[in-house]
Swiss-Prot record:
Annotated substrate binding sites: D121, D168, H252
Phylogenetic placement of the source organism: Archaea, Methanobacteriati, Methanobacteriota, Methanomada group, Methanobacteria
GO biological process annotation, one example: glycerophospholipid metabolic process
Descriptive protein name: Glycerol-1-phosphate dehydrogenase [NAD(P)+]
Family classification: Belongs to the glycerol-1-phosphate dehydrogenase family.
Binding site for NAD(+): G94, K95, V96, I97, D98, T116, A117, A118, S119, S125
Chief localisation class: cytoplasm
Length: 347
C-alpha cells in the first residue's frame, strides 16, 4: 500500500470562554506577525471581534475580511489579502470555515477553525464545500492545525444549526454502510479505525439525543466533540468516506434542484432515513433519533416539495459517480424513488 500522510489538528480547545484565549493559542502554535480573521457578516460581532482583540493583545497585527457565501470568488477574495500572513482563522459557520480553510490551503498557510455553530463536520475535516455553477463541490483541503470551539457562543446559536450538525453525524451510519459495500464489491480501500471512530460518534449522538436541548452549553459541547471526531475520521481515512455516502449524494442533488434547500445536515438526516431502508436496516431507528433532537424527518419539515425529493433520489447516483453506494450505477427509477419516500414516510 502506498504511504499516506494523515493530517490532524494539533490543538483542540473546547469550553465556555475559550475564544478569549485565541491569541495565546496562536502564540503556543508558534505563529507571529500578521493574522487573517475571516468572518461572516454576523459572526464578526458574535465572535470575530473577541478573537481579534485576543490576537492584538498578544501582539499580532490583524487583518479581517467578511465573506457572504462559500464560492471560489470568496476564496480568491480572501487569498488576495494573505501576503505576509502567518495564520488564517475562520470565525463563523460552515461557509466561513470552508472559505478560510480553502484559501489557506491554496496559499500553503496554516488554518485555525473557530466555529460559532455546530452545524456540520467541516469544523475539523480536511474537506471544504465550495459552491460552483453546477452546485456544491467537496474539495480536498488541509486539516486545521487548531480548533477553538467556544461552547458558550455555540450554545447561543439557533438550535436548528446544532440539530443539523447532529443529523449530519447520524448520517455516518449509512455512509459507513456504503463504504463497506464499496469495499466488498469493488475492493475500495477501507479503514477499520476511521469507520469505527465515525460510527462511534453517531452512536454517541443517538445515545445522548434526549439530552440535546436548546441553549445548553453541555449540548453544544457534545455536538462539537462529535463533529470534531467525525472530521478526524475523515483525516484518518484520507477521504470523506466515513461521513459521506448515498445520503450526502441525495443532499447535494437537493441543493442543485430545490428552490430553497434546507440545511446540509437536515437534508442528510432525511436522506439517511431512506438510504437505511435501501440497505435493509432499521430506518425507523434513524427517524426516531432525528425526531428526538428536533431535526426534520419529512419533506414538509424540510420545507421542500415532495416532487424535489423524488427527483433528487433519481439523480443522486450521478453525484460523484466514482463513489459507489447503495444507489449503484443506475440509481432509482422514479417509481422506486416515490415508493421509497412514501414507505419511509418522508412524503
Amino acid at each position: 500500500m502506498d504511504p499516506r500522510k494523515i493530517q490532524l489538528p494539533r490543538e483542540i480547545y473546547t469550553g465556555p470562554g475559550v475564544i478569549e484565549d485565541t491569541g495565546r493559542i496562536c502564540r503556543d502554535l508558534r505563529f507571529e506577525g500578521r493574522a487573517m480573521v475571516v468572518t461572516g457578516p454576523r459572526t464578526l460581532q458574535i465572535a470575530g471581534e473577541a478573537a481579534i482583540e485576543s490576537l492584538q493583545a498578544e501582539g499580532f497585527e490583524v487583518d479581517q475580511v467578511t465573506v457572504d457565501d462559500a464560492t471560489m470568488a470568496s476564496v480568491r477574495n480572501v487569498q488576495d489579502g494573505l501576503d505576509g500572513v502567518s495564520v488564517v482563522l475562520g470565525v463563523g459557520g460552515g461557509k466561513v470555515i470552508d472559505v478560510a480553510k480553502m484559501s489557506a490551503t491554496l496559499e500553503g498557510l496554516h488554518f485555525i477553525s473557530v466555529p460559532t455553530a455546530a452545524s456540520h463536520d467541516g469544523i475539523a475535516s480536511p474537506r471544504a464545500s465550495i459552491r460552483n455553477g453546477e452546485g456544491t463541490a467537496s474539495l480536498e483541503a488541509s486539516s486545521p492545525i487548531g480548533v477553538i470551539a467556544d461552547t458558550e457562543i455555540i450554545s447561543r446559536a439557533p438550535f436548528r444549526l446544532l440539530a443539523s450538525g447532529c443529523a449530519d453525524i447520524i448520517s455516518n451510519y449509512t455512509a459507513i454502510m456504503d463504504w463497506k459495500l464499496a469495499h466488498r464489491l469493488l475492493n475500495e480501500r477501507y479503514s477499520e479505525s476511521a469507520a469505527a471512530l465515525s460510527l462511534m460518534t453517531a452512536k454517541m449522538i443517538i445515545k445522548s439525543a434526549d439530552a440535546i436541548k436548546e441553549g445548553l452549553e453541555e449540548s453544544a459541547r457534545l455536538a462539537v466533540k462529535s463533529l470534531i471526531s467525525s472530521g478526524i475520521a475523515i483525516s484518518i481515512a484520507g477521504s470523506s468516506r466515513p461521513a459521506s455516502g448515498s445520503e450526502h449524494k441525495f443532499s447535494h442533488a437537493l441543493d442543485m434542484i430545490a428552490p430553497k434547500p434546507a440545511l446540509h445536515g437536515e437534508q442528510c438526516g432525511v436522506g439517511t432515513i431512506m438510504m437505511m431502508h435501501l440497505h435493509g436496516g432499521d430506518w425507523q431507528f434513524i427517524r426516531d433519533a432525528l425526531a428526538r433532537i428536533n431535526a426534520p424527518t419529512t419533506a414538509a419539515e424540510l420545507g421542500i416539495d415532495p416532487e424535489y425529493i423524488i427527483e433528487a433520489l433519481t439523480m443522486a447516483h450521478n453525484i460523484r459517480r466514482e463513489r459507489y453506494t447503495i444507489l449503484g450505477d443506475r440509481g432509482l427509477t422514479r417509481e422506486a424513488a416515490e415508493r421509497l419516500a412514501k414507505i419511509t414516510e418522508v412524503i
